[in-house]
Design a protein with these regions (language model features):
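C-terminal structural segments of small proteins and small subunits
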Residues: 52-81
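PDZ/PDZ-like domain segments forming the peptide/carboxylate-binding groove
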Residues: 15-18
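Short alpha-helix capping/helix-loop boundary micro-motifs
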Residues: 23-27
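A generic beta-sheet turn/junction motif
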Residues: 8, 45-46, 55-57
Length: 81
């Protein structure tokens, strides 16, 4: 289990847990992100800035702040494309 920030690009990831309180969980659920959801890390800046993830099931992209992305714990479920 690793943080979304540490995950490799273009690799299917399963959301395992959200580190944080009820507010962060509610916000991520409102964005359509929940446990066991499959996503891919699409883009991440080297030092700071937003993280872009792709929802594999709906083929949509979501931009998250780096602080929120650090609170999303994922596991790798497949090989790179």
């Amino acid at each position: 289990m690793i943080s979304l920030i540490q995950a490799p690009h273009d690799t299917p990831l399963r959301i395992i847990d959200f580190k944080g309180g009820h507010g962060i969980r509610r916000r991520l659920l409102a964005l359509g992100l929940h446990r066991n959801h499959i996503i891919e890390l699409d883009s991440r800046s080297i030092f700071r800035g937003p993280v872009l993830i792709k929802d594999v099931t709906s083929d949509t992209s979501i931009a998250l702040g780096r602080g929120i992305a650090q609170k999303i714990m994922v596991e790798i479920v497949g090989e790179r494309k």
